[in-house]
């Protein structure tokens, strides 16, 4: 009984080299709880105020194949970005419960309000366009969420019932995201055009660097709103069944019904061409006048060197491997964006409509709305045969209906002002029966065997099934495959568990998965009228063009996935002092997988089609995962050193072997410490994360020294104080 008060206060540090607000991380968590009215009524109230600095430095590059050469790559573009990212968040929780004579009523409420601000300074190099861009972008996303759950649990004469009803609502709003870029043309990159095996760092080193010859290209902004609401109700019943002296059973059955409604709309504005275009001269001169610079009708260039922030430095960007130049002044760029937004009508009256106007294509093409309905029911039994054998058979029905409206359109040279499109709504039902069986045999107190057969499904991300089609002017079609089936996995598991005072808990086991309808991103070609199934329904594709289709597909072949897992948790209490405080946790998983990715490259006729199918690992599946932690406990002090290792992961599918990508192997070390203090239940703690500065990295599979992406967050640390009264 009585009230209990907990309080946590934490400060944090971000170790990335070029972060200016390294010590601005904090977290404060007060909570109070108690029981009243003879312990029947309980209250729990908690708040969480948090600020996190999540700045990162990134590298990315895009590659292509050189004609029909299957062994060399061509570098298309390279990009470097410095991304200061600040996330402010406030969470609140109120949980009320009332104990009945044979059950409990519980009412839970959780709320979250967060703001994420990102400033993006970037440089990009386009080899085909022989151009070098400097960009600055800003985004502010307001995310609000609330979840309410009412549950009723009660034991009737023989049946136990659990009823639950929940509601959740979330909305993400970006009131004014913007970006602006300068460019230099030519940029000294012609020598790399369509050349084989060019290291992307060579492109960066060769680019011509001169801020006075790099001029304003374009500005853009957008505002968006994305709401989502869900309702869910469920009920479960348990009934004991007596089947004899040595056999007891419990039957459990129930169901769930959930509805979801979501939508997205965006309004986008920007420059249709470039501020250096003669048609936008009027707008360029207005900008020059606003900036207080001399106006010359014959020289409307707006050079980058007017906007350089001399107080900002990129520091040791990605360990000094790449260099970024000329950081743009945030306040000057923001001021210019606001000027363009306020002067949109004046630009048009000067004949410079394309300098800044509503972009009808981007304001339309990604909008959507939709509903989802999930209904499920199950029945299962827990059968105990004596003290050693437990059998749990069951079957589950799950139906899932999606109904989404998306945009289908044809791009054209005037799509900026008038996008040719239609809205399409498609409804799809996906019913499944999912049987399962679990068996546990415990021949000894210190050993048991667990076997399981199960069927699981993984639904495609809703963004991939919205019936959107985006046909470009260059025979490239982005086609959302609304007929995607969920991936299904038939699973077999066998695990042996040992538990003994000195051994601790040791589990050794294996698993086998047969995956059908594996979902993965894909591009393929379709000549002329063969592209009809992927093209706009109100017109035909051009017969003389060979279309490239970008989409997600199901693999119609079965993917086999095998694995071995070892988990050991122990405390060396039996060793002599001071070693008796050591604790150890280890987990190793080895996975062997093979997937066949079918692909036919379309020729001019079916007779000239080329089968370029290939076999590789299961996408997004590492071969080796190893988690290790070693700790030491002594009275109120503890320290834990942990390591996470993950082997490279097959992450990019392509019919061209040299364009397939994998993540680089990842290894991260962390340290956690805590010390109980002798006053008021105080505890001091600290965490040091990623102390070896591991980076997220993907590379070309055939050329593991050639990066496709790199993301560096640096080391982080927290120190805090907990109070329990």
Question: Where are the regions a protein language model picked out?
Answer:
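Transmembrane beta-barrel wall of Gram-negative outer-membrane proteins
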Residues: 20-121, 137-151, 437
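Short loop/turn motifs that connect adjacent beta-strands in outer-membrane beta-barrel proteins
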Residues: 36-41, 102, 157-160, 241-251, ...
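Flexible glycine-rich, low-complexity coil/linker segments exposed to the extracellular/periplasmic environment
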Residues: 190-217, 278-365, 525-554
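Gram-negative outer-membrane beta-barrel transporters
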Residues: 512-514, 531-650
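C-terminal beta-signal and adjacent terminal beta-strands/loops
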Residues: 271, 275, 645-653, 673-725
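Outer-membrane beta-barrel signature, preferentially recognizing the C-terminal barrel domain
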Residues: 134-151, 370-373, 427-428, 457-515, ...
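Transmembrane beta-strands of outer-membrane beta-barrel pores
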Residues: 3-9, 49-53, 100, 111-115, ...
């Amino acid at each position: 009984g009585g009230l209990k008060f907990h309080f946590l206060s934490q400060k944090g540090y971000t170790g990335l080299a070029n972060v200016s607000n390294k010590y601005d991380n904090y977290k404060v968590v007060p909570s109070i709880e108690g029981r009243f009215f003879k312990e029947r009524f309980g209250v729990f109230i908690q708040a969480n105020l948090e600020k996190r600095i999540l700045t990162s430095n990134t590298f990315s590059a895009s590659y292509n194949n050189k004609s029909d050469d299957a062994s060399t790559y061509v570098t298309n573009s390279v990009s470097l970005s410095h991304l200061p990212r600040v996330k402010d968040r406030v969470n609140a929780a109120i949980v009320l419960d009332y104990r009945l004579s044979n059950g409990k009523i519980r009412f839970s409420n959780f709320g979250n309000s967060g703001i994420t601000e990102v400033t993006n300074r970037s440089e990009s190099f386009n080899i085909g366009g022989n151009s070098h861009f400097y960009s600055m972008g800003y985004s502010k996303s307001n995310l609000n969420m609330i979840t309410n759950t009412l549950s009723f649990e009660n034991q009737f004469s023989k049946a136990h019932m659990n009823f639950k009803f929940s509601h959740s609502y979330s909305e993400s709003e970006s009131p004014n995201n913007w970006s602006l870029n300068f460019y230099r043309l030519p940029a000294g990159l012609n020598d790399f055009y369509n050349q084989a095996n060019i290291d992307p760092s060579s492109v960066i080193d060769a680019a011509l660097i001169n801020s006075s010859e790099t001029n304003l290209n374009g500005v853009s902004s957008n505002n968006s709103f994305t709401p989502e609401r869900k309702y869910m109700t469920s009920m479960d019943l348990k009934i004991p069944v007596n089947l004899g002296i040595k056999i007891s059973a419990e039957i459990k059955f129930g169901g769930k019904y959930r509805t979801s409604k979501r939508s997205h709309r965006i309004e986008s504005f920007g420059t249709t061409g470039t501020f250096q275009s003669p048609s936008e001269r009027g707008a360029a001169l207005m900008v020059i006048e606003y900036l207080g610079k001399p106006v010359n009708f014959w020289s409307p260039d707006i050079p980058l060197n007017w906007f350089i922030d001399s107080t900002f430095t990129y520091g040791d960007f990605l360990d000094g491997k790449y260099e970024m130049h000329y950081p743009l002044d945030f306040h000057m760029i923001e001021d210019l964006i606001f000027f363009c937004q306020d002067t949109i009508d004046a630009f048009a009256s000067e004949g410079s409509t394309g300098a800044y106007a509503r972009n009808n294509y981007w304001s339309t093409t990604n909008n959507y709305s939709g509903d989802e309905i999930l209904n499920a029911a199950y029945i299962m039994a827990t059968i105990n045969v004596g003290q050693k054998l437990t059998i749990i058979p069951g079957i589950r029905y799950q139906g899932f209906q999606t109904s989404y409206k998306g945009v289908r359109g044809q791009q054209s040279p005037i799509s900026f002002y008038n996008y040719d499109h239609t809205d399409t709504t498609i409804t799809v039902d996906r019913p499944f029966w999912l049987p399962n069986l679990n068996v546990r045999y415990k021949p000894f107190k210190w050993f048991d065997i667990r076997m399981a057969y199960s069927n699981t499904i993984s639904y495609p991300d809703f963004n991939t099934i919205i019936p959107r089609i985006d046909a470009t002017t260059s025979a490239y079609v982005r086609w959302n495959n609304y007929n995607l089936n969920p991936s299904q996995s038939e699973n077999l598991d066998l695990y042996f568990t040992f538990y003994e005072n000195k051994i601790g808990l040791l589990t050794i086991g294996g698993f086998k998965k047969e995956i059908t309808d594996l979902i993965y991103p894909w591009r393929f070609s379709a000549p002329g009228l063969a592209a009809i199934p992927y093209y706009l329904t109100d017109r035909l594709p051009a017969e003389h063009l060979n279309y490239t289709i970008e989409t997600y597909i199901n693999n119609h072949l079965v993917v086999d996935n095998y694995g071995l897992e070892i988990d050991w948790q122990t405390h060396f209490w039996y060793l002599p002092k001071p070693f008796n405080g050591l604790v150890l946790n280890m987990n190793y998983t080895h996975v062997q997988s093979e997937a066949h990715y079918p692909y036919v490259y379309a020729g001019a006729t079916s007779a000239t089609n080329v089968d370029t199918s290939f076999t590789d690992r299961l996408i997004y599946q590492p071969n080796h995962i190893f988690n290790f932690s070693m700790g030491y406990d002594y009275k109120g002090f503890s320290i834990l050193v942990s390591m996470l290792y993950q082997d490279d992961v097959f992450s990019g599918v392509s019919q061209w072997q040299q364009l397939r990508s994998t993540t680089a192997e990842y290894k991260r070390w962390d340290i956690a410490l805590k010390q109980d203090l002798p006053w008021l239940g105080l505890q001091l703690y600290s965490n040091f994360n990623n102390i070896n500065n591991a980076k997220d990295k993907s590379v070309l599979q055939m050329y593991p020294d050639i990066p496709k992406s790199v993301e560096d967050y640096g080391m982080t640390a927290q120190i805090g104080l907990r109070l329990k009264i």
